[in-house]
Amino acid sequence: MQKIPLIVIAGLTATGKTDVAIELAQLIDGEIVSADSMCVYKYMDIGTAKPTKEQRQIVKHYVIDVVFPNEDYNVALFQKDATKAIDEIYQKGKIPLLVGGTGFYIKSIVDDIEFPEMGDSKQVRQNLYKELEEKGNMYLYEMLKNVDSKAAQSVHPNNVKRVIRYLEIYFLTGKKPTDFLEKVRKKGSKKYNILPLCFVMERSLLKERIDARVEKMFKIGLVDEVKMLLEMGYSKDLKSMQGLGYKQVIPYIEGNITLEEAKEELKLRTKQFAKRQSIWFKYQGDFIYLDVGNLEFKEVVKKCFELCKSVV
């Protein structure tokens, strides 16, 4: 069976993946599958740095706006949606590009990961967020320590989303999260001929990029977007509303912090997120790492285009 060519553009937030991918897709007659765990949510555009409608008119994108903010979405669902999209793109005679910064989403395709079955997590998650609101994050963290000390050691108590995710696994499967995740099988993709690119950047330059991106988000209407979501009835406790760009703005809307404090908090959290991404991607040895920090946009596109010739 002939393998499907697949161009992967992964990497750190604010390194220009989207713009390069759109330009590259036009050069190789491709379409883009988004690999971003926040871009799946409808109505959440600015805080997720989602490709604009204009960009999506230039090059078709998949796995964007697939669920409402109060609906569940996870890596297993992404794998199913992305695989379908890649097949559809290839059947049209075009080249699929998998683009984003959510590492586990990308690895689910690149490694063809096989996920054990889990039940519906919505009610469990709601109960855990209620516990969080009433008793605080340390209560949940201590709960995780009692359930699985190894999992607790791997996560900071303030990383509430990850703590809750681990507890979900326990309550849905009855197994320790670490035991459950060890059963996730990496088969290695036999279906795709993959060019795995990963954009990286020197830390000080990346921090400047992040600061500029956050300022732009506020300038083009991030606060109004978060207000709109709250007015639509989407709770601040939802998984989607706990994401970067939303969680940091809500205290400002509630009158608890100033606008400048909200900006600084988002900048800080985004930099921390980028650091976690950097560590994660650093240990994924199957990527070709491109330092895009000191390259002109056209140079990055050209370099990617030349590398594409090995699989296209």
UniProtKB/Swiss-Prot annotation:
Cofactor: Mg(2+)
Site residues (Interaction with substrate tRNA), renumbered to this chain: 102, 125
Cited InterPro entries: Dimethylallyltransferase, IPT, P-loop_NTPase
Broad enzyme group: transferase
Interaction with substrate tRNA: annotated span: 36-39
Pfam family, one: IPPT
This protein's UniProt keywords: ATP-binding, Magnesium, Nucleotide-binding, Transferase, tRNA processing
SUPFAM superfamilies: P-loop containing nucleoside triphosphate hydrolases (SSF52540)
Protein residues bound to substrate: 13-18
GO biological process, one term: tRNA modification
EC number, as in UniProt: 2.5.1.75
Reactions that this protein is recorded to catalyse: adenosine(37) in tRNA + dimethylallyl diphosphate = N(6)-dimethylallyladenosine(37) in tRNA + diphosphate
Assigned protein family: Belongs to the IPP transferase family.
Subunit structure, as described in the record: Monomer.
Classification via PANTHER family: TRNA DIMETHYLALLYLTRANSFERASE (PTHR11088:SF60)
Function recorded in the entry: Catalyzes the transfer of a dimethylallyl group onto the adenine at position 37 in tRNAs that read codons beginning with uridine, leading to the formation of N6-(dimethylallyl)adenosine (i(6)A).
NCBIfam families per UniProt: miaA
Protein name listed in UniProt: tRNA dimethylallyltransferase
Organism: Caldicellulosiruptor saccharolyticus (strain ATCC 43494 / DSM 8903 / Tp8T 6331)
